């Protein structure tokens, strides 16, 4: 049987797309492999958010060129595909830089992958168009991959933040209909999925057609999904502060399937830098939004994204970011040094922050965020919480899952609990995971 190796870089959307490309190839008779050396088709599903991520792809392509040659010497053909946002942004440039690549395909065209692979027998192929048809209408049924699953409901972004390539690589905001999303969710649950994370570049800008033909909000969509039998939990990511509607806030208080966790990027605490980033909100507007969300769901866990060293950022600007982090308190966060991306307005600026200053600021920010994360996890010790068991744990007799607040937990229980929700008493907080015991385990130890 033919074998396909699919490697994904970057965001949850890419993870979803990688899985769907594997589904497309499976429908053509390819079995998935984790061993690139035995693959007849190698797909790199790429990320273009930061320069380092893009350069990793070219390093990997250099290694694949050698592998392709070695397999050819032993009589095996290998097709190499570059997909995702680097493919969309760089197109034919990839063919120039990486001679071993056979197919370059953008994120809106991967449903055509079988045809593109056939065409590549004759000539190298680039498809980075934004097709008129909806790719989701041409994708095969999804294969079950576990207890949790991503489900794309929205793609693209109209915000045009000054640092971001997404509007150029993913296009304008488009949303799937409520019916299409509910249908895919129902099939996921029938396959064993119990928690679904709704994903989009700007997921709370969701505006797919509802049952009456009128645009529905993300809150309305989650209400519809809560009626899917067997679905236990709902999450969503990534959101923009400017699209946070009242009904979405209300969903955190009224919909029992919506988990008390929110990833809401702010990027900076400085109003001057937020304006330069074209974020169209202030630090205080973000604070007020968080206050409203916490009023609706007091126990909600908050996560965010931060960029340090954006062009023109001063010590005073960075101090405002540190103040915002201190004011709000996060359970987790992602922070990065600014990386210029070609074609974005920020890349044209000449007031770059020195690399050494970026490094120093990032270290200070990450130290504060790490302290907040450790404090948040430590506060969980002694609490009783419901864990959705996702898989076996690191040690025999152990399983692993997540709290409603997206904290990883390890505890002793049989593998038969996978896919169920188990009450667990948290007994210890590690650096990245919590540890606990079931009520039965605690009683036995007493």
Curated annotation (Swiss-Prot):
SMART domains: Elp3. Residues 378-440 form the TRAM domain. Belongs to the methylthiotransferase family. MiaB subfamily. One of its GO terms (cellular component) is cytosol. This is tRNA-2-methylthio-N(6)-dimethylallyladenosine synthase. Coiled coil: none annotated. One of its GO terms (molecular function) is metal ion binding. Residues 2-122 form the MTTase N-terminal domain. The keyword Nucleotidyltransferase does not apply. It catalyses: N(6)-dimethylallyladenosine(37) in tRNA + (sulfur carrier)-SH + AH2 + 2 S-adenosyl-L-methionine = 2-methylsulfanyl-N(6)-dimethylallyladenosine(37) in tRNA + (sulfur carrier)-H + 5'-deoxyadenosine + L-methionine + A + S-adenosyl-L-homocysteine + 2 H(+). It comes from Methylorubrum extorquens (strain PA1) (Methylobacterium extorquens). Keywords: 4Fe-4S, Cytoplasm, Iron, Iron-sulfur, Metal-binding, S-adenosyl-L-methionine, Transferase, tRNA processing. PROSITE patterns: MTTASE_N, MTTASE_RADICAL, RADICAL_SAM, TRAM. It is found in: Cytoplasm. Residues 143-375 form the Radical SAM core domain. Binds 2 [4Fe-4S] clusters. One cluster is coordinated with 3 cysteines and an exchangeable S-adenosyl-L-methionine. HAMAP family: tRNA_metthiotr_MiaB. Its EC number is 2.8.4.3. The keyword Phosphoprotein does not apply.
């Amino acid at each position: 049987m033919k074998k396909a190796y699919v490697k994904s870089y970057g965001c949850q959307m890419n993870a979803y797309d990688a899985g769907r490309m594997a589904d497309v190839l499976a429908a053509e008779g390819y079995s998935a492999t984790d061993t690139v050396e035995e693959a007849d088709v190698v797909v790199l599903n790429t990320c273009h958010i930061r320069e380092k991520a893009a350069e990793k792809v070219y390093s990997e392509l250099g290694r694949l060129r050698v592998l392709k040659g070695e397999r050819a010497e032993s009589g095996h053909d290998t097709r190499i595909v570059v997909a995702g946002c680097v493919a969309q942004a760089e197109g034919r440039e990839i063919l120039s830089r990486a001679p071993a690549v056979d197919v370059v395909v953008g994120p809106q065209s991967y449903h055509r992958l079988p045809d593109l692979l056939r065409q590549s027998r004759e000539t190298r192929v680039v498809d980075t168009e934004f097709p008129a048809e909806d790719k989701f209408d041409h994708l095969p049924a999804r294969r079950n991959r576990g207890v949790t699953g991503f489900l794309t409901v929205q793609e693209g972004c109209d915000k045009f933040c000054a640092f971001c390539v997404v509007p150029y690589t993913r296009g304008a905001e488009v949303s799937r209909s409520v019916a299409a999303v509910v249908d895919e969710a129902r099939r996921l649950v029938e396959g064993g999925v119990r928690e679904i994370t709704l994903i989009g570049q700007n997921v709370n800008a969701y505006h797919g057609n509802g049952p009456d033909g009128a645009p529905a909000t993300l809150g309305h969509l989650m209400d519809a999904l809560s009626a899917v039998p067997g679905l236990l939990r709902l999450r969503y990511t990534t959101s923009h502060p400017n699209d946070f509607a009242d009904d979405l806030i209300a969903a955190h208080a009224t919909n029992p399937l919506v988990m008390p966790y929110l990833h809401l990027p702010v990027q900076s605490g400085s109003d001057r830098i937020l304006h330069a980033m074209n974020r169209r909100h202030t630090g205080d507007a973000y604070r007020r939004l968080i206050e409203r969300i916490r009023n609706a769901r007091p126990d909600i866990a908050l996560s965010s994204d931060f960029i340090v060293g954006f062009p023109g950022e001063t010590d005073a600007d960075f101090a405002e970011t540190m103040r915002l982090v201190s004011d709000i308190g996060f359970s987790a966060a992602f922070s990065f040094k600014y990386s210029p991306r070609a074609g974005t307005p920020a890349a044209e600026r000449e007031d770059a922050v020195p690399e050494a200053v970026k490094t120093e600021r990032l270290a200070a920010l990450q130290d504060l965020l790490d302290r907040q994360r450790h404090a948040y996890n430590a506060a969980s010790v002694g609490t009783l919480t419901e864990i959705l068991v996702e898989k076996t744990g690191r040690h025999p007799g152990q399983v692993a899952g997540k709290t409603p607040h997206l904290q990883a937990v390890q505890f002793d229980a049989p593998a038969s609990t996978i896919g169920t929700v188990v009450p667990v008493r948290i007994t210890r907080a590690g650096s990245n995971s919590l540890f606990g015991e079931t009520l039965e385990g605690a009683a036995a130890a007493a």
